[in-house]
């Protein structure tokens, strides 16, 4: 067995988020033994000293604003969800109960967003060396499963009502409750509404901080969906109030709104599965990333390109870049880093520089993944 010399260049300076990796030199390697670093870069990598920005004494104002909005909206949502459950029970309306189930999806998503904002501030450990961001995904999966159970029970009760026909609905109570539901959803929408268009016209993190917080934006979209459902319940309440013989509208609305609730959770479940399966996250195109890297002067080829996400909004990248023999490794590294961060704003990037070899053309391990 041939001997291998390992030069360990790992520097774990306290608070730093940019690390030199390990350089291996082997006689059997097809890569020439040149001193080229493997560098891991995070979003803070442009600032190697963090003394100027103490996250403990100067909390992120964007996260603080998002947290306040979510606290207000979740409190309103919880109070009225309980009110809708009581109102739906008194009115004997499954449609209102289904609307309450949709409020449960809103409340769960807000709690998950609040939890994500809190847990993302926790420091990484030797065991959880990427941090605790995936806890948000597990919470989302749990909330989806619980909502499915509640919706399934309501659909079962609606089927029983249509079959038996032995039920009465108090139209006045249903009308009052559904009217309040519309008003409350409008209030929650105003509480979560953010000014600005959410577009970035620059590549700096200062520009991105002016964009809408993704957690608040997701909660706002949930509330808009629930507002539309509440309007539907209000229309059904008017029909039943003036035409009590049309009481079957209530279980029919339950079916329709259950589909809406399940449709909402399916989009969440799709995102959860994509993160857990470490698929390429939404908003990041694999081919675009590959072409962007190949367009850098001095880059001849690349391989081992992997793009995944810690959470839905935190993409991660690792790649090996093969450069020309006369190319400046540090210059290529800087350009590649800046272009990737400017376009995709990766949470963490690991870029390893190698010298290009003709053997890479026929190496199966250097080929890209299937379409």
From Swiss-Prot:
Disulfides per UniProt: none
Reactions accelerated catalytically: Zn(2+)(in) + 2 H(+)(out) = Zn(2+)(out) + 2 H(+)(in)
Gene Ontology biological process terms in this record: intracellular zinc ion homeostasis; zinc ion import into lysosome; zinc ion import into mitochondrion; zinc ion import into zymogen granule
Coiled-coil region(s): none
Stretches assigned to the Cytoplasmic side: 1-69, 121-136, 194-219, 270-303
Binding positions (Zn(2+) 2): 49, 303, 320, 354
Transmembrane regions listed in the UniProt entry: 70-90, 100-120, 137-157, 173-193, 220-240, 249-269, 304-324
Induction: Down-regulated upon zinc starvation (at protein level). Up-regulated upon zinc intake. Up-regulated by dexamethasone.
GO molecular function: identical protein binding; metal ion binding; zinc:proton antiporter activity
Keyword hit for ATP-binding: no
PTM info: Phosphorylated at Ser-295. Phosphorylation at Ser-295 prevents localization to lysosomes. Dephosphorylation of Ser-295 which triggers localization to lysosomes, accumulation of zinc into lysosomes and lysosomal-mediated cell death is induced by TNF-alpha.
Binding site for Zn(2+) 1: 102, 106, 222, 226
Topology feature Lumenal, residues: 91-99, 158-172, 241-248, 325-371
Annotated positions of the Phosphoserine modification: 295
Locus of motif Lysosomal targeting motif: 293-294
InterPro entries given in the database record: Cation_efflux (IPR002524), Cation_efflux_CTD_sf (IPR036837), Cation_efflux_TMD_sf (IPR027469), CDF/SLC30A (IPR050681)
Family: Belongs to the cation diffusion facilitator (CDF) transporter (TC 2.A.4) family. SLC30A subfamily.
PANTHER family (alphabetical): CATION EFFLUX PROTEIN/ ZINC TRANSPORTER, PROTON-COUPLED ZINC ANTIPORTER SLC30A2
Subunit structure: Homodimer. Interacts (via lysosomal targeting motif) with AP3D1; in AP-3-mediated transport to lysosomes. Interacts with TMEM163.
Identification of the protein by name: Proton-coupled zinc antiporter SLC30A2
Source lineage: Eukaryota, Metazoa, Chordata, Craniata, Vertebrata
